[in-house]
């Protein structure tokens, strides 16, 4: 092989190795769990390895209307079934508005999209939401628990929010206690319903049939089972009908004798 040809071959090999190196780097990042789907601000889907992001929004308005804003981001690892939450603190305007809503017995609402990682629009599939009295959130110092209910297809079918402690007792709360959320999150996977006990039912029927075959006493006819009740009834009817038959015969004989005497 000539020198120029050997040099061209080595150059081609170097180019192939260089092209394969970024691919391995990307693969190692995925294996290490660095890639996440839907972790952006909008909770949209990107490349990932089994982790999806959900945008958590909340709403608390003076007129009790629903105007949702971002509260934080939920990260759901679908491989190990874990759920985590990152959220921002309330600013001064939001703290004041939350106090006003609580004073008016208004509601504090939360919502998450039904389809994790789905873009906004018709494909988003809508939202699931929940609410608590705003006064209970204020008096709990923003301590709440979020539970995410999911189905086997990986869709969100429900969300619930509760405050600790719950209830509204009219306690005074300092402004510093309404800055940071103290939230615990929980993932509620689908519960498999128990299947019909067909096999157990068939086995029980077979055992009953085998027991009847071993005990022929249960195979007797109706008369064989209840003859001790039937025979006395028949004898009683026969004996009670005998005098009536004799009386009818005597009356017939008397009539015949009177006729012969004429």
Swiss-Prot record:
Q: Which GO terms describe its cellular component?
A: EMC complex; endoplasmic reticulum membrane; membrane
Membrane-spanning regions, if any? 222-242
* Signal sequence, renumbered to the chain: 1-25
Sorted UniProt keywords: Angiogenesis, Endoplasmic reticulum, Membrane, Signal, Transmembrane, Transmembrane helix
Q: Cite the ranges annotated as topological domain Lumenal.
A: 26-221
Membrane topology annotation: Single-pass type I membrane protein
Q: Which GO terms describe its biological process?
A: angiogenesis; positive regulation of angiogenesis; positive regulation of endothelial cell migration; positive regulation of endothelial cell proliferation; protein insertion into ER membrane by stop-transfer membrane-anchor sequence; tail-anchored membrane protein insertion into ER membrane
Q: Which of the residues are on side Cytoplasmic?
A: 243-262
Intracellular or extracellular location(s): Endoplasmic reticulum membrane
Coiled-coil segments: none
Q: Which domain of life is it from?
A: Eukaryota
Name the job this protein performs. Answer: Part of the endoplasmic reticulum membrane protein complex (EMC) that enables the energy-independent insertion into endoplasmic reticulum membranes of newly synthesized membrane proteins. Preferentially accommodates proteins with transmembrane domains that are weakly hydrophobic or contain destabilizing features such as charged and aromatic residues. Involved in the cotranslational insertion of multi-pass membrane proteins in which stop-transfer membrane-anchor sequences become ER membrane spanning helices.
Q: How does it assemble?
A: Component of the ER membrane protein complex (EMC).
What family is it from? Belongs to the EMC10 family.
Name of the molecule in the record: ER membrane protein complex subunit 10
Lineage of producing organism: Eukaryota, Metazoa, Chordata, Craniata, Vertebrata
Gene that codes for this?
Answer: EMC10
């Amino acid at each position: 092989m000539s020198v120029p040809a050997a040099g061209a071959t080595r150059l081609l090999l170097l180019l192939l190795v260089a092209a394969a190196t970024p691919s391995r780097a990307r693969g190692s990042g995925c294996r290490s769990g660095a890639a996440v789907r839907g972790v952006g601000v909008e909770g949209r889907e990107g490349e990932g390895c089994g982790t999806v992001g959900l945008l958590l929004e909340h709403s608390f308005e003076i007129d009790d209307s629903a105007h949702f804003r971002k509260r934080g981001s939920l990260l759901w690892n679908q491989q190990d079934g874990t759920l985590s939450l990152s959220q921002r603190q309330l600013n001064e305007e939001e703290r004041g508005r939350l106090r006003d809503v609580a004073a008016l017995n208004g509601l504090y609402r939360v919502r998450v999209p039904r389809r994790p990682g789905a873009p906004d629009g018709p494909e988003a599939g809508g939202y699931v939401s929940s609410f608590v009295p705003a006064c209970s959130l204020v008096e709990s110092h923003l301590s709440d628990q979020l539970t995410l209910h999911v189905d086997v297809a990986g869709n969100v079918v429900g969300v619930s929010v509760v405050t600790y402690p719950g209830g509204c007792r009219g306690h005074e709360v300092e402004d510093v206690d309404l800055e940071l959320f103290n939230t615990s999150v929980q993932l509620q996977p689908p519960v498999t319903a128990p299947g019909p006990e067909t096999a157990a039912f068939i086995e029980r029927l077979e055992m009953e049939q085998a027991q009847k075959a071993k005990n022929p006493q249960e195979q007797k006819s109706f008369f064989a089972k209840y003859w001790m009740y039937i025979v006395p009834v028949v004898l009683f009817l026969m004996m009670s009908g005998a005098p009536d038959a004799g009386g009818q015969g005597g009356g017939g004989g008397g009539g015949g004798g009177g006729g012969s005497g004429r």
